[in-house]
From Swiss-Prot:
One of its GO terms (molecular function) is thyroxine 5'-deiodinase activity. One of its GO terms (cellular component) is endoplasmic reticulum membrane. The keyword Membrane applies. This is Type II iodothyronine deiodinase. The active site is at residue 160. Induction: Treatment of larvae with thyroid hormone T3 causes a significant decrease in intestinal levels. The thyroid hormone synthesis inhibitor potassium perchlorate (KClO4) significantly increases intestinal levels. Thyroid hormone T4 causes a decrease in intestine at day 3 of treatment but levels return to normal by day 6. Expression is significantly reduced in liver in response to all three treatments. Its EC number is 1.21.99.4. Plays a crucial role in the metabolism of thyroid hormones (TH) and has specific roles in TH activation and inactivation by deiodination. Catalyzes the deiodination of L-thyroxine (T4) to 3,5,3'-triiodothyronine (T3), 3,3',5'-triiodothyronine (rT3) to 3,3'-diiodothyronine (3,3'-T2) and 3',5'-diiodothyronine (3',5'-T2) to 3'-monoiodothyronine (3'-T1) via outer-ring deiodination (ORD). Catalyzes the phenolic ring deiodinations of 3,3',5'-triiodothyronamine and 3',5'- diiodothyronamine. Its main location: endoplasmic reticulum. It is found in: Endoplasmic reticulum membrane. It comes from Petromyzon marinus. Residues 27-288 are cytoplasmic. Residues 1-5 are lumenal.
């Protein structure tokens, strides 16, 4: 995490405090709701089923998210960082062509397309990563951009409820605006890992201990996307360089065109809005 000076601390403290206050209120409301339900049904459910949000791990995560936002290397109209990412095998034929260096022992293998069963898979903990990582390739984020076409980049992870909730809306954009823009999902570190800071309503995915774990989660997230709304999905490298460069932390949307940032989305989760990207693409489509 970047070094934090006093000025940055003073700038981000109000946001950190307001987010922690929101988490405290959320926990209080959840407790009262469970207590009321228990009194009405004369039964009690363990708090293990309702993890608290205001925890030491949660506050650290909120703090880190604001530090990343303050130190992001992008600005509207500025150059887009060409971060290192890991491409998965089995991209759809409608994806733009790109050049990547195949990883490890499978550099001469042809990626195997995902089967129907794999496409229907939900995000679960998996210890078998060989089949997923065998067709990965080291790439750069801007390898997926084409000249004069907007590239919509969607950063997020399956354990973050707002990201998953708006995934269908994002897939609608992929389907409806394929003629004017390209799309890319960058799978970053888990926002709410099940073994550290789980969120109610989030998919249960543990922390990524190795690149294979992240590639498995990214591959399974791609399986949740409908065929007509599917786009390339890549994984951030384990040094989280894309996450740091773009100041993501939880989820964020960008539009890149000709190497420049044309749309800079708000900080997730509260200002992560797919509808704003839709408005941007509608203006692009109308100008053609």
């Amino acid at each position: 995490m970047p070094h934090v000076n006093l000025l940055v601390v003073l700038l981000i403290l109000p946001g950190v405090f307001s987010n922690c206050l929101f988490l405290a209120l959320y926990d209080a409301v959840s407790f009262l709701r469970r207590a009321l339900q228990a009194s009405l049904t004369h039964s009690a459910k363990g708090d293990a089923q309702h993890p608290r949000m205001l925890t030491a791990q949660g506050m650290l995560s909120v703090w880190r998210s604001y530090v990343l936002d303050a130190h992001k290397k992008v600005r509207l109209g500025g150059k887009a960082p060409n971060s290192s990412v890991v491409a998965l095998g089995g991209h759809s034929s409608s994806s733009p062509s790109f050049s990547c260096a195949a990883s490890s022992s499978s550099s001469h293998e042809t990626p195997t397309p995902r089967t129907t069963a794999e496409a229907a898979a939900t995000v679960t903990t998996s210890t078998t990563t060989t089949s997923t990582t065998s067709s990965t390739a080291a790439c750069r984020l801007l390898d997926f951009a084409r000249a004069h076409r907007p590239l919509v980049v969607n950063f997020g992870s399956a354990s973050u409820p707002p990201f998953v909730e708006q995934l269908g809306e994002f897939c609608d954009l992929v389907r409806d605006f394929a003629g004017v823009a390209d799309f890319l999902v960058v799978y970053i570190e888990e926002a709410h890992p099940s073994d550290a800071w789980p969120a109610p309503g989030g998919l249960e995915v543990p922390r990524h201990l190795a690149l294979g774990d992240r590639c498995v989660a990214a591959s399974q997230l791609r399986g949740l996307m409908p065929p007509l709304g599917r786009c390339p999905v890549v994984a951030d490298a384990m040094d989280n360089n894309a996450n740091i460069d773009y100041g993501v932390s939880y989820e964020r949307l960008y539009v890149i065109q000709d190497g420049r940032i044309r749309y800079l989305g708000g900080k997730g989760p509260f200002f992560y809005r797919v509808r704003e990207v839709k408005s941007f693409l509608e203006s692009v489509k109308a100008s053609r």
